[in-house]
């Protein structure tokens, strides 16, 4: 697992102490600027969380009999979204408020890509869909190779 440090100033003594602490509990340390951190976290954390909230909200607004069956027959993907959507709403409200510029940038990129996928489905562009799905599958393989797959459990720190 990683710990990202975004130093406000270049106080080497402070950075050394912080790095030492996080390394002592088995984390790999990365240092990056706050702006870069915000963009990375927007894509890897904040947008997936927002998508989960949106999908679960959409499901909750379906007609009662459909909503009940969505819940009853939840597949793994939907259950993963409900896990995310079950997170602390106050914390996430604050995350989106504090990181709004990076979130809006990445959300714009995501919605453009989603619209492109919607168009491909509408036009039955199976070649584009397969190409897109294959390239995203490669990203998953890289994540697995790096040992970053699966859910985060603090008790797993340092385990592969």
Language-model region placement:
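Internal alpha-helical scaffold of NAD(P)-dependent oxidoreductase catalytic cores
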Residues: 1-83
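Glycine-rich loops and low-complexity Gly/Arg-rich segments
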Residues: 27-30, 54-57, 109-111, 120-122, ...
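Short, intrinsically disordered/low-complexity patches at protein termini
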Residues: 54, 63-65, 116-117, 127-129, ...
């Amino acid at each position: 697992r990683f710990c990202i440090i975004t130093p406000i100033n270049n106080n080497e003594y402070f950075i050394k102490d912080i790095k030492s602490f996080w390394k002592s509990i088995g984390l790999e340390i990365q240092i990056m600027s706050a702006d870069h951190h915000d963009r990375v976290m927007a894509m890897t954390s904040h947008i997936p969380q927002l998508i989960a909230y949106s999908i679960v909200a959409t499901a909750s607004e379906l007609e009662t009999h459909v909503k009940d069956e969505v819940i009853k027959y939840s597949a793994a993907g939907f259950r993963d979204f409900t896990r995310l959507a079950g997170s602390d709403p106050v914390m996430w409200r604050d995350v989106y408020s504090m990181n709004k510029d990076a979130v809006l940038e990445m959300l714009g990129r995501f919605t453009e890509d989603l619209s492109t996928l919607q168009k491909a489905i509408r036009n039955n562009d199976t070649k584009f869909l397969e190409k897109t799905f294959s390239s995203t599958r490669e990203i998953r393989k890289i994540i697995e190779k790096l040992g970053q797959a699966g859910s985060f459990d603090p008790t797993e720190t340092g385990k592969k």
